[in-house]
Amino acid sequence: MRALWVLGLCCVLLTFGSVRADDEVDVDGTVEEDLGKSREGSRTDDEVVQREEEAIQLDGLNASQIRELREKSEKFAFQAEVNRMMKLIINSLYKNKEIFLRELISNASDALDKIRLISLTDENALSGNEELTVKIKCDKEKNLLHVTDTGVGMTREELVKNLGTIAKSGTSEFLNKMTEAQEDGQSTSELIGQFGVGFYSAFLVADKVIVTSKHNNDTQHIWESDSNEFSVIADPRGNTLGRGTTITLVLKEEASDYLELDTIKNLVKKYSQFINFPIYVWSSKTETVEEPMEEEEAAKEEKEESDDEAAVEEEEEEKKPKTKKVEKTVWDWELMNDIKPIWQRPSKEVEEDEYKAFYKSFSKESDDPMAYIHFTAEGEVTFKSILFVPTSAPRGLFDEYGSKKSDYIKLYVRRVFITDDFHDMMPKYLNFVKGVVDSDDLPLNVSRETLQQHKLLKVIRKKLVRKTLDMIKKIADDKYNDTFWKEFGTNIKLGVIEDHSNRTRLAKLLRFQSSHHPTDITSLDQYVERMKEKQDKIYFMAGSSRKEAESSPFVERLLKKGYEVIYLTEPVDEYCIQALPEFDGKRFQNVAKEGVKFDESEKTKESREAVEKEFEPLLNWMKDKALKDKIEKAVVSQRLTESPCALVASQYGWSGNMERIMKAQAYQTGKDISTNYYASQKKTFEINPRHPLIRDMLRRIKEDEDDKTVLDLAVVLFETATLRSGYLLPDTKAYGDRIERMLRLSLNIDPDAKVEEEPEEEPEETAEDTTEDTEQDEDEEMDVGTDEEEETAKESTAEKDEL
């Protein structure tokens, strides 16, 4: 019995010791979740203690303090307009709740600006707290989000006035704007801050909002509201802030995402990374620290070392405490807005590497920018800006061109991000430019809808465009031609078409291929410099490719005389040139249209007139008989040297290239009356009087105007000229038949000779067919044999009858 009692006692002692050991391990190895306590075990320096106190101050009230607050607080009703306004905010912005944090940080920044301004004239203004910061802390356990600033703070009266009522005129205007925006289906996400009501966006994510504030001229007070009513009471904790304001949000269940550190950090970086004051978030990180070993572990390690070195005798040194490396989670304030707004610094003080680093951080690009410009605009509106040209065009640059919103220009007002969701900061053709615009003259948190009608926007836009074009103009020629033009050339051409006020500046940026060089592109300035002495027009030829353009009959005489011709090979090129009335006093001439004339001497003029008179019978015959319904007129050409003829559009008609483009667009967008009208316009038929075909036609029609061969030749020449001039034939079968007839005549083949009929071949017999035929033949032979036997029998019977 005694043995059993002793055994049981031993088991109890062992179990107690085991539990005790487990408890000790748990205490050492578990990370505490209370944000108000230190996570750094053995560290007790002043810095850690200070951080602990800061964390405790940001925590919510305890149960007894909350009870006292509820019992003794003075209750207030919101103004009727405030109630209506809060409902509008909550109902209109429920899909864009995240802006609440931007509004709270913006208000905190304003409060910090105010106390800093006061401190310039009052040396004791910062005595309560020397720091000028914004701090954010998430408390998942208590479902609280704290935003604290060390700004000017609010007195009791200011809490009631600023958070419970709004100036009536401002409220009415705000409500009208909100209602209009909702009726028009526009975004209201930025409108709330325009009238100083951004604070109420906190109710988008919070069931209850608690504001703790300390002003230098009053004691610390607490304002609390559930959006139906609010209360104000002196803080039973006393002065815990020193100076400033803490906004504590009791988050709704569906807003729990805003207690995630990553979510808060991303929102701060998105909206507030360029605020003038440092913004900190209470966050954790894992660090490796050294801790003293326990006695058992140290003794075990010493034993292992003594066993390994038993053969070596050394003098005993002073024993140092044994330590081990342990990973611990450490909580501390993490700075969020570490990227300083370099556009606020003078451009001379910013290094090139800083611009490149800022661009990569700002645009999320891995390549350096092709070009950038940093400037301050002054005058009617003052703003600072940095603009960048990326190395390559963004993907889908022309997808939904004009309707897709560009998010490459970010608007800041006093370093607070407002929006990148609008059309009007940059014109459509500059939709590849990236950058920031920061203005102190615009209203803080101006909405996108209000911004679009803001008179200062047009001024900002105008200056941005001018500065962008200056930046592009300064790109080195080799980089411009090799890189920029390949990536963004189409944008510049669209700019010439769309931007009337900057058309001359944009024209200087245009580049085209030309007959001057087989591969290099040229500017219009360079073309004008190379023009002949008496040349008064800039000649261009449009085609689907360079090869098509330079082999066109329209450029034959120009190239032979040494004139340079610009080749337009992109669909937008001809539109672009048509939008330019002139360049440097020189008008543009499409060589595929009427109007191409050369400077000629009196002798040359007399010779031309003589040729025109000589070929007048042929010209009249073509216009009145052979091509009566196909051409407007027939003339002797001044532009042809090798080709027999060409089809030329009128000055206001479509060239072959333009007609092809317009018809392709018509097929995509449906029938267009104007397309059919322009396509049906008759054109001028130009002949080359020196070509042997034309000269022989003149001889033949003088002999016989009704010669069918000559009539066919005229039509074939017209249709061939149509194709060579870039137009499409309406009836390709008829054209093919005529070509065939001309070939027959050239080979002395009767035009009416028929094609030989192909002899019909009997189908080859298969094995099955052969078997069936054999069986059929055998049956026929048997039938024949039977018939013969019957006939013989009949004959013998007849003979017997006769006998």
Swiss-Prot record:
Instruction: Tell me the residues on which N6-(2-hydroxyisobutyryl)lysine occurs.
Output: K168
Annotated Basic and acidic residues bias: 793-803
Motif SRT pseudosubstrate motif located where?
A: 42-44
Provide the protein's localization: Endoplasmic reticulum lumen; Sarcoplasmic reticulum lumen; Melanosome
Question: Where, per the database record, does this protein carry N6-succinyllysine?
Answer: K404, K633
Q: Which domain of life is it from?
A: Eukaryota
Question: What happens upon changing T483I?
Answer: In 5N mutant; prevents hyperglycosylation and subsequent degradation
Q: Name one Pfam family in it.
A: HSP90
* Binding residues annotated for ATP, in chain numbering: N107, D149, N162, F199
Impact reported for T219I: In 1N mutant; abolished glycosylation by STT3A
The record's listing under CDD domains reads: HATPase_Hsp90-like
Which residues are annotated as site, described as Important for ATP hydrolysis? R448
Cellular component GO terms held in the UniProt record: collagen-containing extracellular matrix; cytosol; endocytic vesicle lumen; endoplasmic reticulum; endoplasmic reticulum chaperone complex; endoplasmic reticulum lumen; endoplasmic reticulum membrane; extracellular exosome
- Renumbered to this chain, region (Disordered) spans 288-323, 750-803
EC number(s) for this protein?
Answer: 3.6.4.-
Tell me the residues on which Phosphoserine occurs: S64, S172, S306, S403, S447
Fill in the PTM field for this protein. Answer: Phosphorylated by CK2. N-glycosylated cotranslationally at Asn-217 by STT3A-containing OST-A complex: this glycosylation is constitutive. In response to various stress, 5 additional facultative sites (Asn-62, Asn-107, Asn-445, Asn-481 and Asn-502) can be glycosylated post-translationally by STT3B-containing OST-B complex, leading to a hyperglycosylated form that is degraded by the ER-associated degradation (ERAD) pathway. In normal conditions, the OST-A complex together with CCDC134 prevent glycosylation at facultative sites during protein folding, thereby preventing hyperglycosylation.
Q: What is the annotated quaternary arrangement, including any partners? A: Homodimer; disulfide-linked. Component of an EIF2 complex at least composed of CELF1/CUGBP1, CALR, CALR3, EIF2S1, EIF2S2, HSP90B1 and HSPA5. Part of a large chaperone multiprotein complex comprising DNAJB11, HSP90B1, HSPA5, HYOU, PDIA2, PDIA4, PDIA6, PPIB, SDF2L1, UGGT1 and very small amounts of ERP29, but not, or at very low levels, CALR nor CANX. Interacts with AIMP1; regulates its retention in the endoplasmic reticulum. Hyperglycosylated form interacts with OS9; promoting its degradation by the endoplasmic reticulum associated degradation (ERAD). Interacts with CNPY3.
What does the UniProt function comment say about this protein? ATP-dependent chaperone involved in the processing of proteins in the endoplasmic reticulum, regulating their transport. Together with MESD, acts as a modulator of the Wnt pathway by promoting the folding of LRP6, a coreceptor of the canonical Wnt pathway. When associated with CNPY3, required for proper folding of Toll-like receptors. Promotes folding and trafficking of TLR4 to the cell surface.
Q: NCBIfam families under this entry?
A: PRK05218.1 (NF003555)
**Family designation:** Belongs to the heat shock protein 90 family.
Entry's free-text remark on domains: The SRT pseudosubstrate motif associates with STT3A during translation in normal conditions, preventing glycosylation of facultative sites until HSP90B1 folding is completed.
Please report the name of this protein according to its UniProt entry.
Endoplasmin
Whichever gene encodes this chain, its name is HSP90B1
